[in-house]
A protein has these predicted regions:
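Beta1/beta-strand and adjacent pyrophosphate-binding region of the FAD-binding site
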Residues: 1-12, 141-151
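Core beta-strand elements of the Rossmann-like FAD/NAD(P) dinucleotide-binding domain
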Residues: 2-4, 101-107, 228-237
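Glycine-rich dinucleotide-binding loop and its adjacent helix/turn
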Residues: 46, 112-167, 171, 196-200, ...
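Rossmann-like dinucleotide-binding cores of NAD(P)H-dependent redox enzymes
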Residues: 68-73, 137, 142-146, 152-212, ...
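N-terminal Rossmann-like dinucleotide/flavin-binding domain of flavoprotein oxidoreductases
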Residues: 2-4, 40-102, 181-207, 356-358, ...
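FAD-site-proximal beta/loop scaffold in flavoenzymes
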Residues: 125-141, 232-277, 281-287, 291, ...
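Short beta-strand "acidic-cap" motif of Rossmann-like dinucleotide-binding folds
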Residues: 27-33, 110, 166-172
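Flexible, glycine-rich terminal cap/loop adjacent to redox cofactors
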Residues: 9-14, 18-35, 40, 47, ...
């Protein structure tokens, strides 16, 4: 066996960022990757979808994707060429709690990401059914696209393919789209997408996917129930966007003494170290803390989608950096509860902190302040007047608690508020910060 300081399984955003950070601080790192470096985000996720979002046609989007993805992948490979990093191009498999493949180390990070989760309904294995990767691999634009699931993935693809010219229908089990977003923002976005021609069937449960012969050829339908009525929609392609599940198969976790939680995630403590005891069936491990041991040297960690905490590429990155800091004995001030998120529809939506509904449910006193894009000079000049900002803050001191934005460049705007919340700043301090005129950022200081 070859000894090293740190083993990382998975070269996605969390894995390769942790490797680069550890190498910079003098650790010898071995990182395993059985597929392309960069993970889902770079190869078949956030980056390819953004080339679609910012392309004028389906053909242009595919061409740009084939240029952008290899370029960024080459950048990741360059990062991993650091003299302190050894990239092993094979899947990392545990031999024991300190050994992966032919390498042994005191510290191991599992950063294997997640994969699409399909719903168990008849016909789900039909050739017309694809996940997000399959949709990105389509060579021709579908005339009719049915999307099952109105989460971030489903809504982004609905927006993009509608703009490309597909007839898009979305079927969602819940009463509103984007359950992780503020309900007010989610509703406004859905209404705007409906105006663009997308059909939404909310509070609807998919029952089956069936195909039948017809004089014009094969017909495929999605059968669903809505308020007791049996309905159906025909589609040429059916995207299943009903969530993701952690990638844990084939890692031989049992050899390392690791037991999955009931939801198939790897349970971790507040430092993302894998909990030493097997979780009980139905036990909530999200807040469970295992005893710390100094700087945590001699531990196995799980970061990113595989621990189920926050399934976001940037969450995986900061979790990886935090783990390396703990291994090195370095304290940091990363606030994992202040985690911004965005959806790149047209218009965009973004958020950071608890929604208005969550604040009410928690009994947290708060004030809500709003402003609208239609009153912003830059938005008017751009022709992007559909949008709103909602800032929640404490009633007395005015400390910022959350931000919820719907409109052009929402993902960029929310980042400023994220910084203020992280620093414990107030709404007054935000308002008293000078903003360039004319910019969309002025909507933040124009709240009532």
């Amino acid at each position: 066996m070859k000894e090293t300081d740190l083993i990382i399984i998975g070269a996605g955003p969390g894995g390769y960022k942790a490797a680069a950070y550890a190498a910079k601080h003098g650790l010898k790192v071995v990182i395993f990757e059985g597929a392309e470096v960069g993970g889902t985000c770079l190869n078949v996720g956030c980056i390819p979808t953004k080339t679609y979002v910012h392309s004028g046609s389906f053909t242009e989007a595919r061409e740009r994707m084939t240029q952008v993805v290899p370029q960024l992948r080459s950048g990741v490979e360059s990062i991993l060429s650091h003299p302190n990093i050894s990239l092993v191009r094979e899947k990392g498999v545990f031999v024991d709690a300190n050994t992966v493949g032919d390498y042994t180390a005191k510290n191991i990070i599992i950063a294997t990401g997640s994969t699409s989760k399909l719903i168990p309904v008849p016909g789900i294995d039909s050739p017309e059914v694809v996940d997000s990767t399959g949709l990105l691999n389509l060579e021709t634009l579908p005339k009719r696209l049915c999307i099952i699931g109105a989460g971030v993935i489903g809504m982004e693809f609905a927006s993009v393919f509608n703009r490309f010219g597909s007839e898009v229908t979305v079927i969602e089990f819940l009463k509103e789209c984007l359950p992780a977003f503020d309900s007010d923002i989610a509703k406004r976005l859905r209404k705007q997408m409906e105006k663009a021609g997308i059909t939404f069937n909310m509070s609807s449960g998919v029952k089956a996917i069936v195909s039948e012969a017809s004089p014009s050829g094969k017909r495929t339908k999605v059968l669903f129930e809505q308020k007791g009525k049996e309905l159906s929609v025909e589609a040429d392609v059916i995207l299943v966007a009903t969530g993701r599940k952690p990638n844990t198969e084939g890692l031989n976790l049992e050899a390392a003494g690791i037991t999955l939680a009931p939801n198939s995630t790897i349970p971790v403590d507040e430092n993302f170290r894998i909990l030493p005891n097997s979780p009980l069936k139905g036990e909530d491990t999200s807040q469970k803390v295992s005893p710390l041991r100094g700087d945590l040297e001699g531990s196995v960690f799980a970061i990113g989608d595989v621990n189920g905490r926050q399934m976001l590429a940037h969450a995986a990155e900061v979790q990886g950096i935090h783990v390396v800091n703990r291994i090195l004995g370095i304290e940091d001030n990363i606030r994992f509860e202040v985690m911004p998120a965005a959806i790149f529809t047209n218009p965009e939506a973004a958020c950071v902190g608890p929604s208005e509904d969550q604040l009410k449910e928690a009994g947290t006193p708060f004030e809500c302040h709003k402003s609208f894009y239609r009153a912003n000079g830059k938005a008017l000049a751009m022709g992007e007047t559909e949008g709103m900002v909602k800032l929640c803050c404490e009633p007395k001191e005015g400390r910022l608690l959350s931000a919820h934005i719907f409109g052009a460049h929402a993902a960029d705007l929310v980042q400023e508020v994220t910084a203020y919340i992280t620093l414990g700043a107030t709404l007054r301090q935000l308002r008293e910060t000078v903003h360039i005129h004319p910019t969309l950022s002025e909507v933040l200081i124009e709240v009532n």
